[in-house]
C-alpha cells in the first residue's frame, strides 16, 4: 500500500534511516517494529543517533526504505501488534501522515516517539505517543542548552496541550545526565508535568555509547538519589526509571 496523504506526499516518500523488526519495550503493551525516520531539527547533547540528524542520507551508510517496512509488515501479520515511528524526529517528515495511515490500514496500531512538530496531523491515527521532555519545560535557556535550538520549548508546550486534550495514551520521558540536568531540575520538570495532570512519566538515564555530540562520563548508579526518586515517583499513576 502506497498510502497517500490528501495534502502531502505518499508514504513511499518517507525517508527511513533504519528498521528494528521486533521490540517489546518501545510501544507499551505491544509487540512492535520500530521505523527510524531520517532528519531531526534538534542537536541534543545526549543524541545517540547523530547520523540521522540531516534530512539527506549519508552516502557512506546504508539506509532503509518504505518498501522494506511494508514488506516486513506483510510478513509479520499476526506476530506484531504495531509500529513505532522514531528517529531522528519523525514528525519532521512530510510523508509521515500518509505513512501512519497506511500502517493503520494494514491492521497495525501506530506509536510515535516525538518531541514534536506536525503532531496534530497524525494524532487522530495514533494509539500511543512517547513525548520527549528534553529540558525543564518552563526554562527556555535550559532547552537551548540541551537541544542547541533557541525557543525549542514553544512547540513542545503546544504538543503537550494537544496530547492532554486528545485522550490518546502518552508517556512523557526525560533523558538525563547530571552534567546537564540537576536533581533540582528533575524535580521542577516533574512538578510541571504533575500540575498539568500528566499520568505517565519516565526518567531515562543517559547512556554512554560512542558517537555522542558531547562526551559525558558514566552516570553514578546512585544518581539521582533515592530521596529524589521518591519525590519523582509521587503524583504520577506510572513512573518508570530506565537505566539501560
Regions found by a protein language model. Give the residues of each.
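Residues that line or immediately flank small-molecule/substrate-binding pockets and catalytic motifs
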Residues: 51, 87, 133, 205, ...
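Residue-level preference for long, well-ordered alpha-helices that form the structural scaffold
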Residues: 62-65, 152, 221
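Auxiliary Fe-S-binding modules of radical SAM enzymes
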Residues: 2-29, 178-244
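Short secondary-structure transition/capping motifs
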Residues: 58, 88-92
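A secondary-structure boundary/capping signal
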Residues: 36, 86-87, 115
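Canonical Radical SAM [4Fe-4S] cluster-binding loop centered on the CxxxCxxC motif
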Residues: 4-9, 25-64
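Conserved AdoMet/S-adenosylmethionine-binding subsite of the radical SAM
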Residues: 70-75, 79-82, 91-217
